[in-house]
């Protein structure tokens, strides 16, 4: 096997000759340089993973830690120079602040003495005798570890080694496993210092960790909804399409209503004091505005395209007939979903470890502080690029596999005898020859996605700094341009993958050939394909709507302690990727079928010498659709001619 890249098509005289569209048996590796680049990129990701394992400590974020470097709820290793470190805290799972009503921040560090305790004091303790009694009865020692409970009332150092009196009643909260004071005045001071002055990245990571079970449950909900949508499209009827569109409309309106209701609830809540709550309120307003705009656009499109429902049902029935030639195509997304879940879990674990990476430094008094390591922010950015590029690569592999299977089944003369194992055959061709092409296509998508994220971040930053309307307008225009480019590249990539599956050419050659042949035959199927893609997109919107609604209801209960807007965005992103990985089966099959149809028209004429590969049902469907489009075009021209020939009347004043 010679991996030399793409072939150039030239005649014997050296002049370019016309592309011969035929599925290739003998292939060459394509875009190998891009595959090598992806390998180098993943070498960097593996280095970051190893570094996060060595330097990170996600447990400190998840379980909390005391002032001496001990992680609560765990058995710890000693820190050199800290005599009270290295203790077994297996039974002491809660973080207790000895001066919870008067926390202070000096520089970037929280000036506090914290201990790991087995229980939080649920009643106020007014004297050292009560602190001693609480320790003897509950086994929860609220003074520094070096002081025995017997000496709480006898040692002259007890005042400095025990909590400031009175000790307010407190209750353990799942986030950080901290003992949170319950008296109103202490709670307000405690929360404003502890939560508002924590680094934003750590607050986000803590929100993700505290809601990890909810996030996982919502991903499972997105999986169930995606499966339901996939089987709806598999056995689609006109009635199901009407029910489906009604559900989409109700879902959009319902989510918009809930978001505006939550914003109204926040604005009328006089108890909001934390920055996290204010951030949540701003994010809810942003979500509400964006969802309202999307809802309005989609409702207009649904109203305009409502008359094409019958053609859509026929289109999906033809698609299902193609899928029946390779029925295991419907199970391909399960493998994609499993790989995506594994990668996302690994990515989040590394992110948490990076967020907690720090070097232990012993301060005076034997206390331990963790200083952030240099370069962590750059690693976090590199890690984020890895999330986008690798996720797109996994989804692109699925698109290439499905396109290859459709190509194999389409270019088969014996329709009653489909080829054996088309999916495995397509997967093997992808793995051995065309991984570089998929890497290049996914890289182009990532190059557009990353600036979109940066523009969105800068737009939010400008909004907070109250910059002028012109700058915000320019950023919105940039975001819209990147969005349009992203959608165009997605469509171009899909057709390029199908062309690579047919001809075995590299990405750029395939994209150019696909663009030429689709432009030449666009009159046959552009409107049908666009409406089919629109219906599939509505299916993805339905999955995201109901998943986000579940997230709103779940996260809103803990809104006082979480920056839940970011976990909700993460849930929406994962829900869309899950829905896309499942429903894109139909989208990929549709695009591949129409490209194969265009190739069939280009290379055959339906005669006995050059018969079409397509079946009669597909051909008659395209003809009916073209007649409908031509009739509407003629009707529009006729109405325009009538308007042009209308006699001008005098203006009566």
Curated annotation (Swiss-Prot):
Keywords: Glycoprotein, Membrane, Transmembrane, Transmembrane helix. The chain crosses the membrane at residues 34-54, 213-233, 243-263, 284-304, 334-354, 384-404, 534-554, 563-583. Its main location: membrane. The keyword Hydrolase does not apply. One of its GO terms (biological process) is phosphatidylcholine biosynthetic process. It is a multi-pass membrane protein. GO terms for cellular component: membrane; plasma membrane. Residues 634-644 have a biased composition (Basic and acidic residues). Glycans are attached at residues 136, 151, 412, 503, 521. Pfam families: Choline_transpo. It is found in: Membrane. GO terms for molecular function: choline transmembrane transporter activity; transmembrane transporter activity. Residues 632-653 are annotated as: Disordered. PANTHER family: CHOLINE TRANSPORTER-LIKE (SLC FAMILY 44), CHOLINE TRANSPORTER-LIKE PROTEIN 3. Belongs to the CTL (choline transporter-like) family. This is Choline transporter-like protein 3. It comes from Homo sapiens (Human).
């Amino acid at each position: 096997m010679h991996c030399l890249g793409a072939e150039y098509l030239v005649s014997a005289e050296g002049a370019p000759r016309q592309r011969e569209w035929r599925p290739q048996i003998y292939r060459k590796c394509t875009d190998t340089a891009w595959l090598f680049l992806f390998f180098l990129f993943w070498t960097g990701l593996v280095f970051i993973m190893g570094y996060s394992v060595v330097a990170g400590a996600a447990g400190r974020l998840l379980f909390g830690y005391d002032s001496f470097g001990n992680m609560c709820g765990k058995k710890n290793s000693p820190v050199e120079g800290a005599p009270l470190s290295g203790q077994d805290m297996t039974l002491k799972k809660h973080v207790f602040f000895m001066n919870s009503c008067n926390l202070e921040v000096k520089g970037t560090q929280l000036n506090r003495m914290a201990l790991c305790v087995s229980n939080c004091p649920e009643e106020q303790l007014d004297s050292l005798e009560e602190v001693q009694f609480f320790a003897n009865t509950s086994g929860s020692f609220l003074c520094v570890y070096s002081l025995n409970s017997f000496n709480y009332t006898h040692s002259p150092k007890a005042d400095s080694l025990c909590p400031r009196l009175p000790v307010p009643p407190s209750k353990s909260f799942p986030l950080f496993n901290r003992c949170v004071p319950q008296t109103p005045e202490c709670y307000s001071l405690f929360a404003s210092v502890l939560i508002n002055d924590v680094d934003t990245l750590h607050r986000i990571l803590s929100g993700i960790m505290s809601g990890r079970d909810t996030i996982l449950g919502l991903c499972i909900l997105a999986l169930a909804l995606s499966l339901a949508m996939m089987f709806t499209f598999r056995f689609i009827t006109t009635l199901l399409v009407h029910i489906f569109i009604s559900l989409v409309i109700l879902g959009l309106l319902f989510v918009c209503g809930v978001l505006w209701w939550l914003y109204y609830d926040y604005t009328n809540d006089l108890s909001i004091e934390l920055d996290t709550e204010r951030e949540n309120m701003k994010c809810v307003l942003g979500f509400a505005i964006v969802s309202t705009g999307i809802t309005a656009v989609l409702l207009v499109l649904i109203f305009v395209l409502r008359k094409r429902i019958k053609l859509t049902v026929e289109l999906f029935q033809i698609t299902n007939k193609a899928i029946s030639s390779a029925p295991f195509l419907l199970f391909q997304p399960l493998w994609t979903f499993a790989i995506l879940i594994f990668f996302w879990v690994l990515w989040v674990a590394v992110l948490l470890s990076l967020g907690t990476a720090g070097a232990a430094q012993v301060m005076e008094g034997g206390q331990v502080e963790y200083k952030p390591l240099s370069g962590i922010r750059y690693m976090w950015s590199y890690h984020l690029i890895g999330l986008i590029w690798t996720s797109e690569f996994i989804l692109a592999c699925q698109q290439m596999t499905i396109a290859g299977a459709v190509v194999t089944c389409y270019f088969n003369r014996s329709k009653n005898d489909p080829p054996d194992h088309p999916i495995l055959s397509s997967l093997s061709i992808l793995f051995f020859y065309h991984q570089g092409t998929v890497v290049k296509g996914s890289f182009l998508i990532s190059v557009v996605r990353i600036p979109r994220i940066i523009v969105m971040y800068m737009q939010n930053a400008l909004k907070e700094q109250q910059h002028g309307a012109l700058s915000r307008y320019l950023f919105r225009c940039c975001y819209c341009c990147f969005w349009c480019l992203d959608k165009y590249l997605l469509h171009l990539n899909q057709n390029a993958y199908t062309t690579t599956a047919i001809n075995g050419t590299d990405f750029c050659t395939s994209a150019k050939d696909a663009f030429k042949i689709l432009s030449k035959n666009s009159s046959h199927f552009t409107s049908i394909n666009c409406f089919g893609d629109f219906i599939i997109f509505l299916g993805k919107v339905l999955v995201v709507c109901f998943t986000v609604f579940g997230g709103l209801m779940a996260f809103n209960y803990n809104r006082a302690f979480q920056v839940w807007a970011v976990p909700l965005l993460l849930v929406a992103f994962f829900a869309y990727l899950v829905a896309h990985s499942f429903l894109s089966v139909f989208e990929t099959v549709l695009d591949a079928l129409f490209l194969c149809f265009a190739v069939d028209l280009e290379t055959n004429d339906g005669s006995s010498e050059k018969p079409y590969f397509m079946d009669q049902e597909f051909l008659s469907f395209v003809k009916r659709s073209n007649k409908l489009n031509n009739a509407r075009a003629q009707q529009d021209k006729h109405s325009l001619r009538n308007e042009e020939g209308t006699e001008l009347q005098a203006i009566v004043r």
